[in-house]
Structure formats: C-alpha cells, structure tokens
C-alpha cells in the first residue's frame, strides 16, 4: 500500500525564475526521483511506516504502510480483500432488527420523559426560590399578607 502526498503550491525556494519556468514547462509527476534514506517507524500494533522523500523542491513524500503478522512475516497475499454485499429484500430481513429498533425507541422515550421531569422540577424550584426571595412563599403566607 503506497500513499503519495504532495503540496500543490510550490515552496518559496522553488519560486526563482529558472525553477518556476521549469515547473511550468514540465508536469510535476515527470520530475526525477531523489531517494533519500528511508525513515521507518514501527508502532505497537505491528504496523510499520516508511517514508521516502521524492523531490525536496516539490515537497512530495511516499508513505508505505505494511502490516506484519504476529511473527513479523510479510502478509501472504497482496490482493485486496473482496467484500461481497448481497441485496436482501426488506421483507426477508430478520424480525430481530425491528425489535431492536423498537427497544431503542422505547429507551429513547424513557430518557426524554426523565429529562422532561428534571426540567420541570428545576423550573418549579427556581420559581419557588424567586417567590421566597420576594416574600410570597409559602402560599399560606399570602393570606397573612392580604391583611397588611
């Protein structure tokens, strides 16, 4: 597996008149390959990455990733795994998916109800706090305040 990454904008060092005219005359992929020493990085999950610098003026890098097995050997086949997707009619899908969907909807409804209860309770408590601050709570106190 190889990945070619390049910067579409030329770097500041390549903006001189001779190099910019060379850039305009020849396509960017036709430039000669300058291979430097590879930088290999090995991670914990046995994937090694190696990078080679192709052309320093264009800033292109080829990155190769290879997954090694448990014993460190190369993978046996280099073919890409083929995924087989079969078209199944909706009528023939198992009923479990419908039951699972209904179960998720039920759980969602319960969560929404609980959230609504919490919101309403918080609103009630805020209203009570404001009324206490103004001296209008508890409601039995209102009868006493009428005579004043």
From Swiss-Prot:
InterPro entries named among the record's database cross-references: Ribosomal_cL37
Compartments it resides in: Plastid, Chloroplast
Record's keyword terms, sorted: Acetylation, Chloroplast, Plastid, Ribonucleoprotein, Ribosomal protein, Transit peptide
N-acetylalanine, modified sites: 66
GO cellular component term of the entry, any: chloroplast thylakoid membrane
Region (Disordered): 125-148
First and last residues of the transit peptide: 1-65
Disulphides: none
GO BP term, example: ribulose bisphosphate carboxylase complex assembly
Family: Belongs to the chloroplast-specific ribosomal protein cL37 family.
Subunit relationships: Part of the 50S ribosomal subunit.
Name of the protein described by the UniProt record: Large ribosomal subunit protein cL37
Originating species: Arabidopsis thaliana
Lineage, opening ranks: Eukaryota, Viridiplantae, Streptophyta, Embryophyta, Tracheophyta
The gene coding this protein: PSRP5
């Amino acid at each position: 597996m190889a990945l070619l990454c390049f910067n579409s904008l030329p770097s500041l060092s390549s903006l001189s008149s001779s190099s910019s005219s060379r850039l305009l005359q020849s396509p960017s992929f036709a430039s000669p390959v300058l291979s430097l020493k590879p930088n290999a990085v090995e991670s914990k999950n046995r994937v090694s990455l190696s990078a080679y610098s192709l052309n320093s003026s264009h800033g292109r890098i080829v990155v190769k990733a290879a997954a090694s097995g448990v014993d460190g050997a190369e993978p046996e086949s280099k073919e890409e795994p083929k995924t087989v997707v079969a078209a199944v009619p909706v009528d023939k899908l198992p009923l479990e998916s419908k039951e699972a969907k209904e179960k998720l909807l039920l759980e969602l409804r319960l969560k929404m109800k609980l959230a609504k209860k919490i919101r309403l309770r918080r609103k009630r408590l805020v209203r009570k706090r404001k009324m206490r601050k103004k001296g209008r709570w508890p409601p039995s106190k209102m009868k006493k305040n009428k005579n004043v």
